[in-house]
Curated annotation (Swiss-Prot):
May act as an electron acceptor of the enzyme hydrogenase or as an electron donor to rubredoxin. It comes from Megalodesulfovibrio gigas (strain ATCC 19364 / DSM 1382 / NCIMB 9332 / VKM B-1759). This is High-molecular-weight cytochrome c. Homodimer. May bind 16 heme groups per subunit. 14-15 of the hemes are low-spin bis-histidinyl coordinated, and 1-2, high-spin hemes.
Length: 35
């Protein structure tokens, strides 16, 4: 993987953050339901 300009790196970071948010959302759902 060759390092590219920030313009191409930013969308990847946004996708990673989005996936983490979805992952945390799935993990928190059961706890929220029990609360």
């Amino acid at each position: 993987a060759t390092p590219g300009p920030a313009s191409t790196a930013e969308p990847k970071v946004i996708l990673i953050v989005g996936e983490l948010a979805v992952g945390f959302g799935k993990l928190e759902m059961p706890f929220v339901m029990f609360d």
